[in-house]
C-alpha cells in the first residue's frame, strides 16, 4: 500500500479515475455529527484530507496511470507501509465506505467504547469531546503520529449492582 498526495478536495476524483483504470485506491472518510442551526446533522468528512491510499504494487505502468490522474501531485514514499500501518489503513479505508459512528460511555474519566470502529482503537484514544460527539485516536503512519478524529455517540454508563446489596449475590 502506498500513499498518494493530491490536491485537497480532489480525493474522490482521483479514486474514481484510478478505479476506471482498474487500480484499487481509497480515500478514507468518516461520519460525524455536527450542529447546524440547532439541529444535529450527519456529515461525511475525509479522514486524511489530500491523501489517497493506493492498494496496488507500484509498477511503472501503475506509476504512469497515477501520474496521469488529474489532481495527483506526487507519491509520498516509494517504500511500502509496515504491516501494522497497512492494517490500520485497511481498517480505516473500510472498503471505500465511510466509517460510521461509534458508541461508548465515560466512567471514571475514561472513555469505554461499546460498539463501532473506535473499539479497535480504544487503547489509542487520547481525548474525547462529549458535546461535539467525537473521540480522537493516535495512529502512526510512515513513522509519524497522526491524530484521527471519529464520531462517537455517548451513552449513560451501565449500572453495576453493589455486592453489599441483597439482590446482587443472586445476579452474580
Predicted regions mapped to residue ranges:
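Short, charged beta-turn/beta-strand-edge "cap" motif at the junction between a beta-strand
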Residues: 58, 116-119
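Acidic-enriched and Gly/Ser
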Residues: 1-112, 127, 136-172
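A generic structural signal for beta-strand entry/edge sites
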Residues: 132-134
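Short beta-strand-centered aromatic/proline hotspots
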Residues: 120-128
Amino acid at each position: 500500500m502506498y500513499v498518494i498526495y493530491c490536491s485537497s478536495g480532489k480525493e474522490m476524483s482521483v479514486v474514481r479515475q484510478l478505479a476506471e483504470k482498474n487500480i484499487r485506491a481509497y480515500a478514507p472518510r468518516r461520519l460525524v455529527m455536527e450542529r447546524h442551526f440547532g439541529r444535529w446533522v450527519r456529515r461525511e468528512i475525509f479522514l486524511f484530507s489530500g491523501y489517497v491510499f493506493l492498494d496496488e504494487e507500484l509498477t511503472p505502468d501503475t506509476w504512469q496511470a497515477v501520474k496521469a490522474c488529474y489532481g495527483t501531485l506526487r507519491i509520498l514514499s516509494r517504500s511500502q507501509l509496515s504491516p501494522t500501518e497497512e492494517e490500520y489503513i485497511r481498517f480505516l479505508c473500510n472498503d471505500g465506505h465511510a466509517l460510521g459512528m461509534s458508541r461508548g460511555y465515560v466512567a471514571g474519566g475514561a472513555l469505554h467504547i461499546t460498539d463501532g470502529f473506535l473499539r479497535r482503537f480504544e487503547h489509542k484514544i487520547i481525548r474525547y469531546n462529549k458535546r461535539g460527539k467525537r473521540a480522537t485516536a493516535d495512529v502512526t503512519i510512515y513513522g509519524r503520529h497522526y491524530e484521527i478524529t471519529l464520531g462517537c455517540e455517548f451513552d449513560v454508563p451501565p449500572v453495576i449492582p453493589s455486592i453489599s446489596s441483597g439482590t446482587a449475590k443472586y445476579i452474580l
